[in-house]
């Protein structure tokens, strides 16, 4: 029976609860989730006073599998764990050699492999060993049609509400660029805190991100559905005059 794939939310929940795994291989097309999990581990595993001797950051272009294994086999100094993060691990040419360590990892080492924009071959030893003894997570791009619900979910995690139209406006304007989206949501969260408010509205987005609440895809689709040809033409003309404000190509 195939092992159920763990979700981003489940990984983050376990890390927050300090239920760490000895190996994390974070791979796939979407860098946002890989960065978020890695940042959470960097914040959670070690106290600040423990990091000088027990936290190692390596880069794929400057290291190799043997060096990573040697570092992982060290024991921590005056700490329960040591944390090793390998960034840009897709550049480690002999990365499959890591399987010899991952088959029997140290419980005191937390090894984090950032394998961005690619995926390991799940049929080979490294992926199989990671799946058995740690976390093998594939970070996938979110389809455009799922972005509004994803934005709503992100804001719920921050205990902030968002109007459906506002979520659609952000989705249309930013697409599925999650890093850019996260920066804009951070900005909106700060503004809401200053206003002592807990809800993102189309007006808030229009005022602070520069997306028109009247001339956007949400309103265009609504006008077409209601057969409001005058309004649909007005929005189309606005898109033609302001191509940077229009996230889709008009035909």
Regions found by a protein language model. Give the residues of each.
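Conserved beta/loop motifs at nucleotide-recognition and modification sites
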Residues: 1-251
């Amino acid at each position: 029976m195939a092992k159920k794939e763990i979700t981003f939310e489940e990984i983050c929940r376990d890390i927050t609860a300090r239920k760490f795994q000895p190996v994390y291989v974070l791979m796939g097309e979407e860098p946002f989730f890989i960065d978020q999990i890695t940042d959470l581990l960097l914040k959670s595993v070690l106290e600040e006073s423990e990091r000088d001797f027990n936290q190692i950051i390596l880069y794929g272009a400057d290291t190799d599998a043997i060096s990573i294994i040697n570092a992982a086999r060290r024991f921590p100094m005056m700490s329960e764990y040591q944390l090793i993060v390998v960034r840009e691990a897709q550049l480690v040419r002999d990365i499959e050699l890591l399987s010899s360590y991952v088959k029997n990892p140290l419980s005191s080492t937390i090894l984090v492999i950032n394998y961005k924009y690619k995926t390991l071959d799940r049929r080979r030893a490294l992926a199989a060993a990671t799946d058995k003894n740690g976390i093998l997570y594939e970070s996938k791009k979110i389809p455009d049609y799922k972005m509004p619900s994803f934005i709503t979910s992100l804001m719920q995690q921050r205990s902030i509400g968002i109007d459906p139209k506002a979520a659609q406006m952000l989705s249309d304007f930013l697409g599925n660029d999650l890093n850019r989206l996260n920066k804009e949501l951070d900005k909106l969260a700060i503004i809401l805190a200053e206003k002592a408010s807990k809800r993102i509205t189309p007006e808030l987005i229009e005022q602070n991100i520069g997306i028109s609440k009247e001339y956007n895809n949400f309103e265009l689709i609504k006008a077409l559905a209601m057969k409001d040809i005058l309004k649909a033409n007005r929005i189309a003309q606005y898109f033609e005059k302001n191509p940077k404000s229009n996230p889709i190509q008009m035909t």
